[in-house]
């Protein structure tokens, strides 16, 4: 959902190629465990043989029903996510942060202060949970920040302005 290019058509046209998608990242519902797989028909039949009879819980089924009944919901959320991501990237560029913004729902940011200390302060002082990672290319020790809607990114940015000096 976070990358405009897709390999779905490639998966439909080629054997042994599958594309999987999950809704948990886009909707911030890690426990939902709802997604789908796209691929050539014979391959899908093989996958169906491996599935258990009740592999989706009641919550996930209600969620899927809501998605079917409101098809514009996904596009709306994708656009909100992209707006928030672009807002964060603009802030990072304007404030001379080094970062790696690939096409997922997160990015790596090299803080101006010690990453471990900043993560601890973010949690304790701002109630923001982020992680640190080692050896991310030229960034070295950096933050792994999940991106989201603009309001969430504004909260994160305000915390960065306050704590990362």
List the predicted regions and their residue ranges.
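Conserved PLP-binding catalytic core of the aspartate aminotransferase-like
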Residues: 82, 94-126
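PLP-dependent enzyme catalytic core of the Aspartate aminotransferase-like
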Residues: 124-125, 135-165
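Hydrophobic side chains in well-ordered alpha-helices
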Residues: 47, 118-121, 156-159
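Basic phosphate/pyrophosphate-binding loop/patch that engages nucleotide-derived ligands
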Residues: 9-15
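Short acidic/glycine-enriched loop/turn segments that link adjacent beta-strands
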Residues: 31, 103, 137-141
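PLP-dependent aminotransferase class I/II
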Residues: 16-92, 97-100
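Short beta-strand-to-loop capping motifs
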Residues: 39, 109-113, 147-149
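Conserved PLP phosphate-binding loop immediately N-terminal to the Schiff-base lysine helix
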Residues: 1-8
